[in-house]
Amino acid sequence: MFVELPIVPGVITDNSDLLSEGRWIDVDKIRFEAIGGKSHAQVIGGYEDLSETDFDGKGRGIHRWANLASEELVAVGTTERVYIFAQGIFWDITPIRASATLTDKIDTTDTDATVTVDHTAHGLLTGARVYLHNDTAVGGLSLGVSGTLASGSIQTIEGSKTLVITETAHGLATNDRVTFASATAVGGVGAGAINTTHTVYVVDANTLLVHVATAATSSAAAGGTPTYIGLKEYTVTVVDVDTYTVEAASAAT
């Protein structure tokens, strides 16, 4: 004959075993769950990584919320960047402090990958990040990328704010910036949401993702044949008041 023991939920750790009769006195990694009108001790579920992407810097703050469209969002601030987790990806949303257009201000040295940028009163410090693009190669070096997408290279997924961009050997890296121009609407995402500057998330050498403000209403591949300019991210290595240096991916010729 079996007798049911009516053990109530909760853990008592500061009484003797005798005084704690009918109560749990020692547990590990459990939770209490109501099943069939009774409370049962259940194993706490395991954990899994929210993303396989590593952060730059050390985490200093996290905030979770839902927007008016009931989209779950998480913002993470580190010593290096600010990220937002949206639709399965951590996007770098670190504000850009300042921007400038320079003319004939890039200096290179043959067989050297160090590039000097002449920028009066730039205000940068060693270790700062800059996003660069030069329209014309200097010493054989292009610090950014540019081109024109083939028709149908912008893909939408119904209900998603992520655009899939296909471009053979795009040359960009995650956290670089890309600006599109002359794109047309696709999958319910308007041209205005596409023709702006986006943070890049790289899938592979021929595919990248960008996040837009409007969710697609259908899955489609269109968008016309827009042009794009990609600003690649560099870390400042040496600075003085009016110049700074970065390291290119290859040596100048």
PLM region spans:
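N-terminal beta-propeller domains
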Residues: M1-S99
